[in-house]
């Protein structure tokens, strides 16, 4: 069978001029089932054109889209111990790291960059959810701390884009240590007088929600994002009650005062710039009243 698969079939395909078609050319909308060509999805910032559903956006694409002309300085990835607990579940942790690095072309879940958004200098930190669920381990924690230190030294704001399932279980207590470490880093930035803005994306859960993801001066959220600590199913089983419709979505949190604004992905750079100008007491153009609610909200914060 291997001989047929590895030799005969490729020879026949080459003779007939047939090519193997990648499986991920078409993306299915989770809400409507609509099939979207991957190039069209990428060109629309990973938002389904018809339904407006916000798909998960790769970290590299997020940074390139955020900064002016896609120009920014990538902050270095810190070196930490690899698999210090020699952890193994159904698979070796070292193998999970290797596979995730091949899949995402990243060293770990965090990417950070220094650049300008509509002329305002800032540091942006982005989670890559496809790297072990965007989980927070030693490497991610150290990268976040270093990014906050860079923003403090540059005397500029920091914008966080969390997308995570929480702490990385394969690193045990070493992962949990990153929660207080990142919290201290947030406090140091705030003590320096610089704003800290969080843009909550889908999903933001677990220990990340319990630490730096909910410590911002202003919290924006993308439409339909799942935001919470424990999952909806776990809460229902624990309480033995049915939760409200839309529970743990960004719109539900906005209605209940946990989020300041729900902002479409296309509007995030402009909204961030306008809010940051108010927080840093810089002139704000009012010619375009898009997201004027953000201005009023930030001014009263």
From Swiss-Prot:
Keyword Cytoplasm carried by entry: yes
Record domain CoA carboxyltransferase N-terminal: where: 25-294
PROSITE patterns registered for this protein in UniProt: COA_CT_NTER (PS50980)
UniProt-listed Pfam families: Carboxyl_trans
Entry superkingdom: Bacteria
Molecular function in Gene Ontology: acetyl-CoA carboxylase activity; ATP binding; carboxyl- or carbamoyltransferase activity
Enzyme class, spelled out: transferase
Biological processes, Gene Ontology terms: fatty acid biosynthetic process; malonyl-CoA biosynthetic process
Keyword Lipid biosynthesis: yes
Reactions catalysed according to its record: N(6)-carboxybiotinyl-L-lysyl-[protein] + acetyl-CoA = N(6)-biotinyl-L-lysyl-[protein] + malonyl-CoA
Pathway membership: Lipid metabolism; malonyl-CoA biosynthesis; malonyl-CoA from acetyl-CoA: step 1/1
Any one GO cellular component localisation term in the record: acetate CoA-transferase complex
InterPro entries: AcCoA_carboxyl_beta (IPR034733), Acetyl_CoA_COase_Trfase_b_su (IPR000438), ClpP/crotonase-like_dom_sf (IPR029045), COA_CT_N (IPR011762)
Subcellular location: Cytoplasm
EC number: 2.1.3.15
Keywords: ATP-binding, Cytoplasm, Fatty acid biosynthesis, Fatty acid metabolism, Lipid biosynthesis, Lipid metabolism, Nucleotide-binding, Transferase
Subunit structure of this chain's protein: Acetyl-CoA carboxylase is a heterohexamer composed of biotin carboxyl carrier protein (AccB), biotin carboxylase (AccC) and two subunits each of ACCase subunit alpha (AccA) and ACCase subunit beta (AccD).
Family to which this protein belongs: Belongs to the AccD/PCCB family.
Physiological role: Component of the acetyl coenzyme A carboxylase (ACC) complex. Biotin carboxylase (BC) catalyzes the carboxylation of biotin on its carrier protein (BCCP) and then the CO(2) group is transferred by the transcarboxylase to acetyl-CoA to form malonyl-CoA.
Protein name in UniProt: Acetyl-coenzyme A carboxylase carboxyl transferase subunit beta
Taxonomic path: Bacteria, Pseudomonadati, Pseudomonadota, Alphaproteobacteria, Hyphomicrobiales
Gene transcribed to yield this protein: accD
């Amino acid at each position: 069978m291997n001989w047929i698969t590895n030799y005969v079939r490729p020879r026949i395909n080459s003779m007939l001029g047939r090519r193997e078609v990648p499986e991920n050319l078409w993306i299915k909308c989770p809400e409507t089932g609509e099939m979207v060509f991957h190039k069209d999805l990428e060109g629309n910032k990973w938002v389904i054109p018809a339904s407006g559903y916000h798909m998960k956006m790769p970290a590299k694409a997020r940074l390139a889209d955020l900064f002016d002309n896609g120009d920014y300085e990538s902050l270095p990835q810190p070196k930490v111990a690899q698999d210090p607990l020699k952890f193994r579940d159904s698979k070796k942790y070292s193998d999970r790291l290797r596979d995730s690095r091949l899949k995402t072309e990243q060293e770990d879940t965090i990417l950070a960059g220094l650049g300008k958004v509509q002329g305002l200098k800032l540091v942006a930190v982005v989670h890559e959810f496809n790297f072990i669920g965007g989980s927070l381990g030693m490497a991610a924690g150290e990268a976040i701390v270093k990014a906050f230190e860079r923003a403090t030294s540059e005397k500029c704001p920091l914008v966080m884009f969390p997308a995570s399932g929480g702490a990385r279980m394969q690193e045990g207590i070493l992962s949990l240590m990153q929660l207080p470490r990142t919290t201290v880093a947030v406090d140091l930035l705030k003590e320096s007088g610089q704003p800290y803005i969080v843009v909550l994306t889908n999903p933001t859960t677990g220990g990340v929600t319990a630490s730096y993801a909910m410590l911002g001066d202003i919290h924006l959220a993308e439409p339909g994002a799942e935001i919470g600590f424990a999952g909806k199913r776990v809460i229902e089983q624990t309480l033995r009650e049915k939760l409200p419709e839309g529970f743990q979505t960004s719109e539900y949190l906005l209605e209940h005062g946990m989020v300041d604004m729900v902002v479409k992905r296309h509007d995030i750079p402009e909204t961030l710039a306008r809010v940051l100008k108010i927080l840093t007491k810089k002139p704000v153009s009012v010619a375009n009243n898009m997201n004027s609610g953000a201005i009023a909200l930030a001014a009263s914060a």
